[in-house]
Amino acid sequence: MSDPVFVAFASQKGGSGKSTLTALTASYLHYVEGVDVLVVDCDSRQYTQKDYRDHDIVVINETPALKKAFMNFYKRFDKQPYEILYATPATAIEQAEEYMKDYPAPKVVFFDITGTINDMDLVNLLAQMHYLFIPITTDTGDMKSSIRFANKVMSEMIAPGGSSIKEIKLVWNRIPSRKKSKLCELIDNYLEELQLSSLNTVLSNSARYSKDDGGMAARPTIFRSTMMPPDKQLLKDSDLPELVRELREIINV
């Protein structure tokens, strides 16, 4: 069996959507496409993936329609919910390796990472990733932070060699439409000057990516879940399948 691919959604600061992207892509791969995944949450200040999992458990247990959908799904799905490990940048790799000694190795290990390039523990963790995906939004502050972070990784880690990083891509997230705007295209041109590039697929600024109806709607639905696949109706025009398809082409799984 081939070694797992280490994939990180990373940013210097919160708010760019890296945790949501981690949960969405991990869940789509695992629950829709049947690819075994492991998630390692490395942001010990808040552990967003834990919040997501805890929320999912409560919503599913307290919403009869979702509980029924959950039980029906696992009658035909021959895997368990993917595991989420909670670590620090210093311990993340060791914890993932220890887990894989006791359980079958996943195809992909997703790392949810936040921190500055000046943190040596974070630098050492990033250096062991195979692929990095950095969310970027049209907010000026977030955009500058994402570009600065990606440029530092490229110039100080990838270009000199010595890291395991094979490729780095920025991911346009929370933009006004499903197509790249003129601003996105302008920034993409600037990224080329830095030897960087973004994915072709973009995610629009839609509420479906960050929350669920839970028991509040007449027909309870769930899109971002760590325990179930996204609702099929909500998948329409979400561009999540396209994002995962492009990601799979890059990481070769």
Model-derived segments and their meaning:
Residues 174-223:
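Beta-strand-loop-alpha "switch" segments that mediate conformational coupling across diverse proteins
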Residues 146-162:
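Conserved C-terminal guanine-recognition region of P-loop GTPase G domains, centered on the G4
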Residues 24-28:
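Active-site signature of alpha/beta-hydrolase-fold catalytic machinery across serine-
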Residues 211-241:
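C-terminal boundary of histidine-terminating zinc-finger modules
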Residues 120-140:
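Inter-motif core of Ras-like GTPase G domains
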Residues 1-11:
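Extreme N-terminal, non-catalytic leader segments
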Residues 10-16, 31-109:
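P-loop/Walker-type NTP enzyme "switch/lid" segment
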Residues 20-21:
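Hydrophobic positions on the alpha1 helix immediately C-terminal to the Walker A/P-loop
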